[in-house]
Design a protein with these regions (language model features):
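Conserved active-site loop/cleft motifs that coordinate metal ions or position small ligands
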Residues: 194-198, 227-228
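Residue-level preference for the first positions of well-ordered beta-strands
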Residues: 4-5, 192-194
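Catalytic domains of cell-wall/extracellular-matrix polysaccharide-remodeling enzymes
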Residues: 41, 66-193, 201-218
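Short beta-strand edge/turn micro-motifs at domain boundaries
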Residues: 131, 222-226
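Short loop/turn segments at strand-loop or loop-helix junctions that form parts
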Residues: 60-62, 133, 198
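C-terminal accessory extensions appended to soluble enzyme cores
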Residues: 210, 230-232
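Active-site beta->alpha N-cap acidic-glycine motif
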Residues: 1-104, 110, 217, 224, ...
Length: 232
């Protein structure tokens, strides 16, 4: 057995994203990065750079809304506007887009519209990371295994630092200790997890190179970052 992790990174592209890509390439860490359409329009070349460097880019909506707070039609528009931008980035990179993946902002799957969104994603060729080996009970309790969007089994929670909801020391403690008896533990127990991380300029301003500190910690603990396997 081993400690295996699929690394997923939300909210690209931002100013820090290119440096994160360089770190990932240097350390041979594969990753799936979920892009926000508005951010693609601001930093289009960064998305192209990520694709050229082996990053799989997925869809994270256009304006990052809570999908339970918008209509079904608005949600579809959020997805489709971003699809156009991602396809354009792959075309500019000169590489085929082999995977269509979507992650809901805040993992908010639409509330009473959830099944409508799930049907849309399935009917339009979206895929999910293979989650058949995840052991964290919490992942199954909320039904992530039954859905086609990409969720996660372990949330690093570093995005809480700029708002002072968590200190960086508390983030590192959470990283080292895991989510408790029924949750995921990516550093101390063998297993397989889909990990949620973020590319955030706000976090970089508070803790410069936060991504280096966190990912180095995982590498030093013997975590193996694996390529994502996809399924319909």
């Amino acid at each position: 057995m081993s400690k295996r992790v699929v690394l997923t990174i939300d909210d690209i592209p931002q100013m820090v994203t290119k440096n994160m890509v360089d770190y990932l390439v240097k350390n041979n860490i594969p990753a799936v990065m979920f892009a926000v359409g508005e951010n693609i329009e601001k930093h289009f070349d960064t998305v192209v750079y990520a694709i050229k460097n082996g990053i799989t880019v997925g869809n994270h909506s256009y304006s990052h809304p809570s999908f339970s707070a918008i209509s079904y039609e608005e949600g579809i528009e959020e997805i489709e506007k971003t699809e156009v931008l991602i396809n354009k980035a792959y075309e500019e990179a000169g590489l085929p887009r082999k995977v269509k993946a979507f992650r809901f902002p805040y993992i908010d799957k639409g509330g009473d519209k959830k099944e409508l969104f799930q049907r849309y994603l399935r009917e339009n060729g979206f895929m999910k990371i293979d989650d058949s080996e995840i052991e964290a009970k919490s992942y199954y309790l909320v039904g992530h295994d039954k859905d086609i969007d990409v969720a996660c089994s372990f949330d690093i929670r570093e995005y809480n630092v700029p708002s002072n909801d968590m200190t960086f020391d508390e983030v590192m403690l959470h990283l080292r200790e895991g989510d408790g008896e029924d949750g995921a533990d990516i550093m101390n127990r063998d297993g397989y997890n889909i990990v949620l991380f973020h590319s955030h300029d706000d976090t970089e301003k508070v803790v410069p190179k936060y991504y280096v500190t966190i990912l180095d910690e995982l590498l030093n603990a013997g975590v193996i970052f694996t390529e994502s396997e996809w399924k319909n």
